Every structure is written in C-alpha cells, then in structure tokens.
Amino acid sequence: MSEPSKEQFDEVVREYIDFVNEQVGAYMSALAGFAGHHARFSRQVHRANRPVSTRPPDETGMPTVVWASYEDPSKPDIIHNQIIRSDEYLEANRPGGANEQQHSRSILIFLFTYWEDEIRPRLARAKGVEPNEIQADIMGDLRTLRNIILHSKSVLRPDKHASLRLLGEMFEVNKELEFTYEGMHRIFVLLKQECARLLFGWLGVEDGPVKPEELKDVAIQFGPGRLRKSEPDAP
C-alpha cells in the first residue's frame, strides 16, 4: 500500500483538471496559429504567382519557396530554420494538416505521461492504495494511443484497435491515426468526465443530480473552511 499523503484527493484531481485546461488552451492557440500561417502565406503565394506581363502565365505557376526564420529578416546572414516549397508549407498548415496532427499527438502523450508519472501515484497516496488501483478507461486508451504514436509510427493495428474502450470509433484500422478538432474535443471532455467520476467516488456520491458522463466541464470550489494550499514563497 502507498505511503499516506497529506495531500487531499480532490486537490490532486483539481491539479490535473487545471493541467488539462492548459493543454486545451495551447491546442486552440496552436490551431489559430496554423490557420493564420495558412491564410497569410496563401495570399503571399498568389501575389508572387500572378502574371506581371502581357504574355500568358505558366499553367503550373512560378515555383515559390517559403524561407522561415526566428531572426529579423531585414538583417544579413540570418539563419533560416526552415526552407520549404510553398505548396508543402500550406499543406502542413492547413486544417487537419501535418502540423495540427503533430501538435495533437504531442498533447495526448503529454496528458498521459503527466497522469501516469505524477497524478496517478499522488492520487494513490492520498487514497492509501496502490497506483494500479486508480483506474480510468480514457487513460487506458491514451496509453494505447501513446504507444501507437511512439512505437508504431501512428499506424493503428487491429489488436490495438480492439483494446480501445472509448475511442475506437474515432480511428480506422491499419491506417495512421488522424486527430480531428471534434475528436480532440471529445478526448478533452472524456478526461473531465473521468475527473468527475474520481471525485464522485471519493466523496461517496452514488446517486447525484448529474452523472459524470453527462458533464462537459468540471470546476472545484473550496469553501471558507477549506482553503487551497498557497504556493511557498520564493527564496
């Protein structure tokens, strides 16, 4: 059995809810950034390719290249971190494109790793049980997706698809995992619902006014007799 902890169970759950919310914010900001890049460079490509003489333009258009750098482009000898054809750049930044997929995969791996290595052991200590007694179907699915992303080049094999309890219908067998906006939103909601289920179980709520699977978001409010622990002062 885990060593007893001075942490309250609901405090640890709240920390994970806050962490999920941070990832939701990062995901939405990233999508906005990709969309902005796509719109801005689409206009620039059209301006670069438009005809500037009376002769008909090439049917395929002039080849254009995107030069990207974190440094000031007006300065000489800057280092370009990316040189890519404009069509490939636009394809990567389109809705559902490679950049969105890469970001979605990173977030899901981050969500599972923080749960498995940090939150789950602390929940177990707060409850006085072993970590493997803290179980959640959505976390099992995230573990499977993490392993597919890291070890199978994101290709979903039949045996792994069969092991998905909640997210199986989101993906096709023997194809690369593809995360849509709607799919990511569903995963975020399922994570919040799981946090609610953990709280209901800890509080002993069996017949509440709502069920965890009916919730879309979760917030924990501490009463006047129960204040959150303040952060330690910086040295």
Which ranges hold each PLM region?
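Short, hydrophobic, well-ordered secondary-structure elements
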Residues: E100-R120, M139, R143, N147-L150
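A short mid-domain helix/strand-loop element embedded in enzyme catalytic domains
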Residues: P76-E91, I109-R125
